[in-house]
Amino acid sequence: EKRKLNWDDKLTLEFNGKSPCVSELTIERTDNVPTVFLCGNSTVVDQDNEPWGSWGQMIPRFFNENICFANYAESGESANTFIAAKRLKKALTQMKPGDYVFMEFGHNDQKQKGPGKGAFYSYMTSLKTFIDETRAHGAHPVLVTPTQRHSFGADGKIQDTHEDYPDAMRWLAAKENVPLIDLNEMTRT
């Protein structure tokens, strides 16, 4: 993780364009502004190279200074590997009551096979850990179903490649009374 700029105690700023220019910059700590912690995989992570991009790196553009975003996502992560890599634990150390945790998993979880794996087994168990830990810190969990893959059938329509994972998340959101953003349905064309 040391190769990643977002995994240390430093603030990393990036200025883009043909002639980036900054005349002044003021950085002030604001503990009274809620933070949205983003947990997920490559569809959420701050992508390093263009033309790649994710909703996680774009979403802050739609909000003002009254909310902060902290993107803890990492390419290749599943819900259980995110926990095992201590990415959730790190986010929890920064979390305060009133914050939010948006979690989108399913792409890499769906690829895991074997005993105890599956949408209604290890996937839901891991998501329940996110929900419980988030609530224990006084923050608000929000489940986000996995965005559709760019996979089209012969008829030109999106192929559903996530199997039961979106349904498992929808079921868990209803059972645990957790808000759900159904990105899976929103990205179906």
Question: Where in this protein do the model-derived segments appear?
Answer:
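Acidic/histidine-rich helix-loop elements
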Residues: D46-P51, N71-A85, K111-G118
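Glycine-centered flexibility motif
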Residues: E1, G53-S54, G76, G106
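Alpha-helical cap/lid subdomain in secreted, periplasmic
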Residues: M58, K86-T189
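Intrinsic disorder/low-complexity detector
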Residues: K10-L11, K111
